[in-house]
């Protein structure tokens, strides 16, 4: 990897953040560029998110001087300010269904039970901060990413209006679907339950040629990046699982020439063929599970193997899909930025051009 991201911190620790290695020098960057992304995922913005009040204000600690990146590691930090660790005292010695409590204990023999510690959704703060930088790189190169909520529970969008995405609490491009999603969530909340959904990501301006032909296929890299998000249970590219009931005659994307350029006549593949970008729009979908923290009684056991009926109290999202939209976008941006830098050495002509442009 050329563009590397390390996240650090826990949900109820002093702070969280990220270290980014491999960002080129000379990229215009300030804290506001990153804050815009963090504001899209921060809690407490609607009745459908956790009541935890965090400003999630980012601090750039290194790697930026006089408004531009220096080419050295960029260190970012966001301080936790509204932890309520007492809310988690009742689960210190029991395993919450749907969480990583049991598996962390099995792996490490020890865990931070306060808000899930490292497995908390707050870990994604570092991903989003790094994603903001990756997105700035892509923007400089004419690549744009549009990410939105495709569905919440059984409610799916029936129309697409890009301007509507930031006009509702769910980041849905369909105003009517957003209203129905709100009604569905009200019912979930009344029943002390939660919901999942689907996030769709569309990337335009990507050049053909990104990705490797075997193990590091662009499709595999993107799927790995999205599946590394805690709540993601499945990833689709292009027509996804629908191709299993299709035929080659309808699934294959044909080619034609327009204005002297080779283009595809359709995009069932979602912009990636043979693991390599083909220059058309890249289409991804991430399937998000329902929030596992619910107030309904759930059957579990303690560390001592005693049965227990557990009710999870605290401040939890009835749905995490809207706040995960920018997380999916950030992971896609990080993956593409890295693929771009790796691809710079894919041909000798590109290496010769670099040497030629930098010779005295």
Which residues does each PLM region occupy?
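Generic N-terminal targeting/processing segments that precede catalytic cores or assembly contacts
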Residues: 1-360
């Amino acid at each position: 990897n050329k563009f590397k991201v390390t996240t650090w911190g826990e949900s109820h620790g002093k702070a969280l953040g990220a270290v980014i290695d491999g960002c080129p020098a000379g990229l215009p960057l300030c804290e506001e560029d990153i804050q815009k992304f963090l504001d899209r995922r921060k809690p407490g913005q609607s009745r459908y998110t956790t009541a935890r009040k965090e400003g999630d204000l980012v601090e750039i600690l290194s790697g930026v001087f006089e408004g531009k990146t220096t080419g050295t590691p960029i260190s970012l930090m966001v301080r936790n300010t509204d932890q309520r660790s007492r809310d988690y005292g009742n689960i210190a010695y029991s395993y919450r269904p749907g969480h990583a409590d049991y598996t962390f204990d099995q792996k490490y023999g020890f865990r931070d039970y306060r808000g899930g510690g490292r497995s908390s959704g707050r870990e994604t703060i570092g991903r989003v901060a790094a994603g903001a930088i990756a997105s700035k790189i892509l923007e400089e190169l004419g690549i744009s990413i549009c990410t939105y909520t495709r569905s919440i529970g059984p409610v799916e969008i029936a129309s697409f209006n890009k301007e509507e995405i930031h006009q509702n609490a769910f980041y849905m491009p369909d105003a009517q679907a957003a209203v129905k999603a709100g009604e569905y969530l009200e019912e979930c909340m009344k029943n002390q339950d939660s919901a999942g959904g689907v996030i769709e990501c569309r990337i335009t301006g990507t050049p053909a040629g990104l990705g490797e032909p075997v193990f590091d296929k662009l499709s595999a890299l993107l799927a790995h990046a999205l599946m590394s998000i805690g709540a993601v249970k499945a990833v689709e590219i292009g027509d996804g699982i629908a191709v299993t009931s299709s035929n080659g005659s309808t699934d294959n994307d044909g080619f034609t020439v327009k204005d002297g350029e080779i283009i595809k006549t359709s995009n069932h593949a979602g912009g990636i063929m043979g693991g390599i970008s083909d220059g058309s729009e890249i289409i991804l979908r991430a399937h998000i599970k329902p929030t596992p923290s619910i107030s309904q009684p759930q059957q579990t056991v303690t560390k001592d193997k005693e049965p227990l009926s557990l009710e999870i109290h605290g401040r939890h999202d009835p749905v995490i899909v809207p706040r995960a939209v920018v997380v999916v976008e950030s992971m896609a941006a990080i993956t593409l930025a890295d693929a771009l830098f790796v691809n710079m050495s894919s041909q000798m002509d590109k290496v010769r051009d670099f040497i030629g442009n930098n010779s005295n």
